[in-house]
Amino acid sequence: MFKTILCPIDLKPRSKMALKKAINIAHQFNSKVILLNIHEEFMSKEQMTMSRVSVSKLGDEFKKIALEAKGDMKFLIKELEADDIECEYILRDGKAYDIIVKIAQEKHADLIVMGTNGKDSLTDLFVGTTAQKVVESSICPVLVMPKGN
């Protein structure tokens, strides 16, 4: 039923809970798990230029963050492979909900398993959370790990 499971992960406790759930489902259905790590842009190139922020310095910072994330993900991938679960790792930058939905479509994901970011701000009430936007935009089922799980 679920051949490919997409699991966006940021290495925070909720996304680790989502990964555990994705692993359980992968065992049941002999699924492939795609780990997706996204670093959101907090400022566009135009905003950086106007703020006199160096695009190259931020690019260097992103590379540093990406290398650290890749190292952390290699550990998770080894765990998955030890459990005989086929896996793939993808690193992207951009708006999380856009990237999640796009990768799910590109990789023909049958299921997205994700955690919530845990924010309870007024902005989330009006703008919505990443998980909410993914649920609204995705063409495949989305399993969201709620707070407290």
Model-based region annotation:
Residues 55-69:
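A short acidic, glycine-rich active-site loop
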